[in-house]
Amino acid sequence: MINDLRTVPAALDRLVRQLPDHTALIAEDRRFTSTELRDAVYGAAAALIALGVEPADRVAIWSPNTWHWVVACLAIHHAGAAVVPLNTRYTATEATDILDRAGAPVLFAAGLFLGADRAAGLDRAALPALRHVVRVPVEADDGTWDEFIATGAGALDAVAARAAAVAPQDVSDILFTSGTTGRSKGVLCAHRQSLSASASWAANGKITSDDRYLCINPFFHNFGYKAGILACLQTGATLIPHVTFDPLHALRAIERHRITVLPGPPTIYQSLLDHPARKDFDLSSLRFAVTGAATVPVVLVERMQSELDIDIVLTAYGLTEANGMGTMCRPEDDAVTVATTCGRPFADFELRIADDGEVLLRGPNVMVGYLDDTEATAAAIDADGWLHTGDIGAVDQAGNLRITDRLKDMYICGGFNVYPAEVEQVLARMDGVADAAVIGVPDQRLGEVGRAFVVARPGTGLDEASVIAYTREHLANFKTPRSVRFVDVLPRNAAGKVSKPQLRELG
């Protein structure tokens, strides 16, 4: 019997007790009631235990939004382990680095997906801790999921005990977020934090078991995992995963499933609004949308309300180190407030603006710390418990936060954080590049995209196409610069550091 309800296994147990026959999950090829979802989770958890996964182990998922992701994630928690989501856009090199540092013994990886075979692309020799790879079928019947489940037939009895032993303070997940030095950091969050933050997010949107939630946001991101899977788990809302965003497919899904909840970055709504077939679909069921992660024009919020007929449109601000949360607008806020601010603190957060303008957050949902990096943890969370976000902002008289700049030069491309230092390190290794710097520039569809400024060595014949092609080989697509400017020298300040403001002036 699970007594403490502040764990993911407890949340699923409660859902089954309260809504046993309620539709919990709808995928392209399968539907799950709450009870059927619990049974599938127990089967996968038993298989993990049979494969030798121990409590506090870290198990990774490198796959898109299918029902397998949901089941695998919850199964990892039931086995007492922590889930490590990997961005599906990562290259094999990027994924290998994270898997190595996490010491993951098991990986759920997509088979053929968008022209790449992630499971086959890994260098297993570089990952001695990785004992098992479970292939998740996405575009082809090339998975090993059924074989994986079969291995757990003799371990089902062990699952309940494992699940009951999970404590609220145990680490539930490790999401990796790029750092200003260019190397990713693993953010440790506990069960109580992940559940508390996602429950607060759902409460702001008044989400209930009557809602149907189309999850376009990727599960490897807090917006899809905590504001998606865990929010539905705690409210009973029906989760409908969307594998890859396509405006027409999304419009069909909204009409077919009578979708009420549709979060996503601004580009999602812009694509739906601009689609020539939009008026052919009944979108009247839409009720609640949350956007952010980029500049949001007032006119977009107004069009979402008037043309998509969404009752509640909110914006929010958060970061991985705060469980993806921080501030959020409220249903009663007007379109201007929603578009021009990030709202007020929620999820038990306190907000303060430091003397230098940096946004600080404090509360029980600030991360446990960074994986194997006490120095970085101490730098991020001060002695008084304030999380230093690296963002510059201001608070208006109503308490709404407005982000005005980023201390760390990070920009957001299509909802994904990009740290220039990581891209710059890749460019520095390219033959013919003497110096390089990267900034984010506005883009109508993606919010911001990268622009590289390159100092080429004489006689190398570098051009824009070759630089972009090189970075695409080594980085995820959203990190790849979309344009290149060649300059004789990079502008630097008195301390010898590249002056990003001057680069922005150069365009």
UniProtKB/Swiss-Prot annotation:
It is an enzyme of class 6 (ligase). It catalyses: 3-[(3aS,4S,7aS)-7a-methyl-1,5-dioxo-octahydro-1H-inden-4-yl]propanoate + ATP + CoA = 3-[(3aS,4S,7aS)-7a-methyl-1,5-dioxo-octahydro-1H-inden-4-yl]propanoyl-CoA + AMP + diphosphate; 5-hydroxy-3-[(3aS,4S,5R,7aS)-7a-methyl-1,5-dioxo-octahydro-1H-inden-4-yl]propanoate + ATP + CoA = 3-[(3aS,4S,5R,7aS)-5-hydroxy-7a-methyl-1-oxo-octahydro-1H-inden-4-yl]propanoyl-CoA + AMP + diphosphate. The keyword ATP-binding applies. Keywords: ATP-binding, Cholesterol metabolism, Ligase, Lipid metabolism, Nucleotide-binding, Steroid metabolism, Sterol metabolism. Its EC number is 6.2.1.41. InterPro entries: AMP-bd_C (IPR025110), AMP-bd_C_sf (IPR045851), AMP-binding_CS (IPR020845), AMP-dep_synth/lig_dom (IPR000873), ANL_N_sf (IPR042099). It comes from the Bacteria. GO terms for molecular function: ATP binding; CoA-ligase activity. ATP binds at T177, S178, G179, T180, T181, G182, R183, S184, K185, D391, R406, K497. It holds the Pfam family AMP-binding. GO terms for biological process: cholesterol metabolic process. Involved in the catabolism of the rings C and D of cholesterol. Catalyzes the ATP-dependent CoA thioesterification of 3aalpha-H-4alpha(3'-propanoate)-7abeta-methylhexahydro-1,5-indanedione (HIP) to yield HIP-CoA. It can also use the hydroxylated analogs of HIP, 5alpha-OH HIP and 1beta-OH HIP. It requires that the side chain at C17 is completely removed. Belongs to the ATP-dependent AMP-binding enzyme family. This is 3-[(3aS,4S,7aS)-7a-methyl-1,5-dioxo-octahydro-1H-inden-4-yl]propanoyl:CoA ligase. It comes from Mycobacterium tuberculosis (strain ATCC 25618 / H37Rv). The gene is fadD3.
